[in-house]
């Protein structure tokens, strides 16, 4: 078997509606008391799904997706090779993940997304573009990082354009809170990186504060970084920049 040829993932397609449990509790913990708040990587939203996306979910989950399980994932087994693993949280419709994975065939990309339309779109991209170095987990990202990613194991993490929750009363729902950043940092190997991007300025300010306050991380720039060549500019981003909107990249490295 060629080192770049993936080993098919055994098992049936994962449940399409992900479970959500207490975000930073151990997997075998008892449920929190009613009314307690938890960091979650998503909220349930009803959305349109195309027939092509539906077909991909039905036909390709067993080939390219990894079922959530409350135990550490073995990337070499999942991808069929030993290679640096990059975690992509919230890949949306998969346009950026597809381009990055094709441009960096030497790396493995583990994409985490909860919404059916996005997962179906990414599965279709993997199959039609023949991208052997991408796997998908359809589940809450916080639980995946907590339960399935071993400490000091990731070469990098990408969090591009997470939900900004623009209303002030909803800021507590934003993904990049200190507890989750601390968890992410613990899963990145020394020398690895955490790359975030947002087009909401006040979220960029919060990201800079939260990432800068994490003891395991150090900023690679004085504040915000230039967009690196490996992160492609999306159509939405291009349109926003043309209209005068800003985009902020933050790249932090895990300290040795």
UniProtKB/Swiss-Prot annotation:
Residues given in the record as S-adenosyl-L-methionine binding sites: 88, 113, 140, 163
Disulfide bonds: none
Keyword Methyltransferase: yes
Signal peptide stretch: none
Cross-referenced InterPro entries: SAM-dependent_MTases_sf, tRNA_(Gua-N-7)_MeTrfase_Trmb, tRNA_methyltr_TrmB_bact
Binding-site positions, substrate: 167, 199, 234-237
Keywords assigned by UniProt, alphabetized: Methyltransferase, S-adenosyl-L-methionine, Transferase, tRNA processing
MF terms (GO), sorted A to Z: tRNA (guanine(46)-N7)-methyltransferase activity
Superkingdom classification of source: Bacteria
Matching Pfam families: Methyltransf_4 (PF02390)
Coiled-coil stretches: none
EC number: 2.1.1.33
Active-site residues per Swiss-Prot or TrEMBL entry: 163
GO cellular component: tRNA methyltransferase complex
Pathway: tRNA modification; N(7)-methylguanine-tRNA biosynthesis
Electron transport recorded as keyword: no
Reaction(s) catalysed by this chain's protein: guanosine(46) in tRNA + S-adenosyl-L-methionine = N(7)-methylguanosine(46) in tRNA + S-adenosyl-L-homocysteine
Function: Catalyzes the formation of N(7)-methylguanine at position 46 (m7G46) in tRNA.
PANTHER family given in the database record: 3-DEOXY-D-MANNO-OCTULOSONIC-ACID TRANSFERASE/TRNA GUANINE-N 7 - -METHYLTRANSFERASE, PENTACOTRIPEPTIDE-REPEAT REGION OF PRORP DOMAIN-CONTAINING PROTEIN
Family per similarity comment: Belongs to the class I-like SAM-binding methyltransferase superfamily. TrmB family.
NCBIfam families, A to Z: tRNA (guanosine(46)-N7)-methyltransferase TrmB (TIGR00091)
Protein name: tRNA (guanine-N(7)-)-methyltransferase
Annotated organism of origin: Bordetella avium (strain 197N)
């Amino acid at each position: 078997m060629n080192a770049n040829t993936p080993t098919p993932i055994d098992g049936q397609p994962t449940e399409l509606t992900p479970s959500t449990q207490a975000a930073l509790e151990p997997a075998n913990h008892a449920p929190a008391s009613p009314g307690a708040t938890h960091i979650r990587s998503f909220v349930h939203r009803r959305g349109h799904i195309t027939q092509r996306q539906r077909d991909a979910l039905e036909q390709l989950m067993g080939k390219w997706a990894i079922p959530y399980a409350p135990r550490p994932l073995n990337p070499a087994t999942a991808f069929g090779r030993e290679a640096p693993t990059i975690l992509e949280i919230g890949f949306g419709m998969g346009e950026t993940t597809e381009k990055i994975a094709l441009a960096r065939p030497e790396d493995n990309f583990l994409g985490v997304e909860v919404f059916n339309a996005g997962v179906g779109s990414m599965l279709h991209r993997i199959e039609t573009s023949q991208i052997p170095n991408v796997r998908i987990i359809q589940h809450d990202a916080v639980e995946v990082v907590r339960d399935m990613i071993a400490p000091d194991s990731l070469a990098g993490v990408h969090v591009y354009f997470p939900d900004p929750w623009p209303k002030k009363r909803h800021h507590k729902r934003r993904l990049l809170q200190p507890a989750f950043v601390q968890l992410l940092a613990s899963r990145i190997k020394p020398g690895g990186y955490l790359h975030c991007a947002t087009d909401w300025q006040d979220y960029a300010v919060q990201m800079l504060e939260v990432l800068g306050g994490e003891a395991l991380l150090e900023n690679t720039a004085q504040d915000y970084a230039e967009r690196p060549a490996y992160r492609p500019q999306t159509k939405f981003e291009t349109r926003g920049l043309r209209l005068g909107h800003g985009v902020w990249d933050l790249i932090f490295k895990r300290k040795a």
